Amino acid sequence: MMVAETSIVKKNHQIPRIINQKIAQKLIEKISMTDIAHQLAISTSTVIRKLNDFHFEHDFSRLPKIMSWDEYAFTKGKMSFIAQDFDNLNIITVLEGRTQAVIRNHFLRYDRAVRCRVKIITMDMFSPYYDLARQLFPCAKIVLDRFHIVQHLSRAMSRVRVQIMNQLDRKSHEYKAIKRYWKLIQQDSRKLSDKHFYRPTFRMHLTNKEILNKLLSYSQDLKHHYQLYQLLLFHFQNKEPEKFFGLIEDNLKQVHPLFQTVFKTFLKDKEKIVNALQLHYSNAKLEATNNLIKLIKRNAFGFRNFENFKKRIFIALNIKKERTKFVLSRA
């Protein structure tokens, strides 16, 4: 029996080659597999089969000199681990769990000589990673993400403000003013606007700086912690580790317990914070990658199969789109 053959369709297949190529191109985009199937007028199963054709082999013979660690939520209540090349943004690995055993078992598959080539690891302030990074990468410096260091300070200031505010009468003008303009206390004082606007709470035209001065006049305790908070922000943003930690050590026993907790954490992680101030590396690139991962997951309404999710991440982030130029045909 003669069977017609064509270069358009692979032998013993029904889906044209061009459709398979389109599926591969669409998988690079941050859209769901159901949407891909709908756009190409094929079944979702066909898209999944094409996804399963992708295979990503780990290269255990090399690691980048600078890499970033972070975690992301795969399913509700379950965090997964991700490592990225800091320079070219390629994903090094995506692991289903973030426990020390899971991470250790993966990186021990690399020879010690390969692991010793890693010089910098950027990460969030997640203490279980610290010892693990030192064990696996003995030559690497740990650099904490600057955003999360400032976030710790900001949260301490916010909690102190709330505690002081709750000591006031809830019907009082002072309570309402602090609650209404709480963002001014959290904001960097150098970024406060000096434009006058009518403020209903005070029934007059005031700048943000004038409002802040009124808020601080309601409580000496609030004023003291605000001034300390702003000084710490100033030294941190100016990358002055000696002044930053000098201020912490001088005020450790005098501040609110909420600030004491943060200060003790900073002193314990002093070396890693100094690295963050002296080196220009951060976890910002990996945070941006995590936002793309969240977008992939959200567009797909979540993933039940971790391997499929992992493949979508590698396809979207490690396979670069080829740029094509449109050529106008002449009539």
Task: Mark where each language-model region is.
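Acidic/histidine-rich catalytic cores and adjacent linkers
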Residues: 51, 76-77, 81, 87, ...
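Gly-rich Lys/Arg/Thr-decorated short loops/hinges at beta-loop-alpha junctions or inter-strand turns
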Residues: 3-7, 84-90
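Non-catalytic alpha-helical coupling and interface elements of nucleotide-dependent molecular machines
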Residues: 28, 32, 41, 52, ...
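Short alpha-helix plus adjacent loop in nuclease-associated cores
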Residues: 149-170
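Active-site beta-loop-alpha junctions of metal-dependent nucleic acid enzymes
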Residues: 12-14, 92-114, 120
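Short, positively charged, Gly/Tyr-enriched micro-motifs
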Residues: 1-67, 72-78, 115-118, 122, ...
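Secondary-structure boundary/capping signal
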Residues: 35, 44, 91, 140-141
